[in-house]
UniProtKB/Swiss-Prot annotation:
Domain of life per record: Eukaryota
Tagged with keyword Membrane: yes
Ranges of the Extracellular topological domain: 17-300
InterPro entries: Ig-like_dom, Ig-like_dom_sf, Ig-like_fold, Ig_C1-set, MHC_class-I_related, MHC_I-like_Ag-recog, MHC_I-like_Ag-recog_sf, MHC_I/II-like_Ag-recog
Cytoplasmic side of membrane: 322-327
Statement: the UniProt record of this protein carries the keyword ATP-binding: no
Organism, as annotated: Homo sapiens
Protein name (record): T-cell surface glycoprotein CD1a
Keywords on record: Adaptive immunity, Cell membrane, Disulfide bond, Endosome, Glycoprotein, Immunity, Immunoglobulin domain, Membrane, Signal, Transmembrane, Transmembrane helix
Length: 327
């Protein structure tokens, strides 16, 4: 039954290569099904190339939505129409199957099923595939070696679920083929179609700021790095050539334009900040690291403060005198 949740992987073979893309890549389809009661349900489906969403499913029109100009890969409109029909039919059957077995499996409404399936590439070669199902956000079952296996922590419910799924070996064979054969060909074709976008280099911008005070006599220094692509980046607070091990990196977050943002913080005593710097390494910089010195940031801040405060005072005095003239 669960092979029906992978129709976006069921694409035709495509040529392609992953030249220039050295980091591990994956293509996966995520299916989230929310069952509020026996008749009310919600369906969310998306396709992802690593961290980049490339496809989604419009439940109202029952169509695949291509989020990038190259998301279609090398396939014709007719081929994608066939996939939409396949997806529509199999999604309905998947809902019916889960709802049919909900009572037998002791699924209590409301509940949520999450499925993620796909394949991985490393240095242009297939390195593995995966298909996992979660129930209520917890690991439940996974597909391995052509059959469904329960997670040990999932208990008897998961064992019974696997027993149901493994009754039809033909469907398991289809699932295995989708993961081990069709998906790798699809991701290679997708990489070829999106090569210009995926291999672009966008230089980061960086700036420094104060963070919330960590306590009396201490400062939080913040180094912001934004607008870079691809995602891998190295950011570190330095004292001379010595890396500061207290550097805390946040998550690398996506921006609306498809680039990335990161901030790195460091807490120090106020008197120890002067000779610190933030260093940024990124492939787009071609070895010319960005280095920002905290003492320069502080000097600029004092200059701005020295200019703005008197200016505000002059404006205030001018408004006060003007008000007195009208009285």
């Amino acid at each position: 039954m669960l092979f029906l949740l992978l129709p976006l992987l069921a694409v035709l073979p495509g040529d392609g290569n992953a030249d220039g893309l050295k980091e591990p890549l994956s293509f996966h389809v995520t299916w989230i099904a929310s069952f509020y009661n026996h008749s009310w349900k919600q369906n969310l489906v998306s396709g992802w190339l690593s961290d980049l969403q490339t496809h989604t499913w419009d439940s109202n029109s029952s169509t695949i939505v291509f989020l990038c100009p190259w998301s279609r890969g090398n396939f014709s409109n007719e081929e994608w129409k066939e996939l939409e029909t396949l997806f529509r039919i199999r999604t309905i059957r998947s809902f019916e199957g889960i709802r049919r077995y909900a009572h037998e499996l002791q699924f209590e409404y409301p509940f949520e099923i999450q499925v993620t399936g796909g394949c991985e590439l490393h240095s242009g070669k297939v390195s593995g595939s995966f298909l996992q199902l979660a129930y209520q956000g917890s690991d439940f079952v996974s597909f391995q070696n052509n059959s469904w296996l329960p997670y040990p922590v999932a208990g008897n419910m998961a064992k019974h679920f696997c027993k149901v799924l493994n009754q039809n070996q033909h469907e398991n064979d289809i699932t295995h083929n989708l993961l081990s054969d069709t998906c790798p060909r699809f991701i290679l074709g997708l990489l070829d179609a999106g090569k210009a976008h995926l291999q672009r280099q966008v230089k980061p911008e960086a700036w420094l700021s104060h963070g919330p005070s960590p306590g009396p006599g201490h400062l939080q220094l913040v180094c912001h790095v934004s607008g870079f692509y691809p995602k891998p980046v190295w950011v570190m607070w330095m004292r001379g050539e010595q890396e500061q091990q207290g550097t805390q990196r946040g998550d690398i977050l996506p921006s609306a334009d498809g680039t990335w943002y990161l901030r790195a913080t460091l807490e120090v005593a106020a008197g120890e900040a002067a000779d610190l710097s933030c260093r940024v390494k990124h492939s787009s910089l071609e070895g010319q690291d960005i280095v920002l010195y905290w003492e320069h940031h502080s000097s600029v801040g004092f200059i701005i403060l020295a200019v703005i405060v008197p200016l505000l005072l002059l404006i205030g005095l001018a408004l006060w005198f003007r008000k007195r003239c009208f009285c």
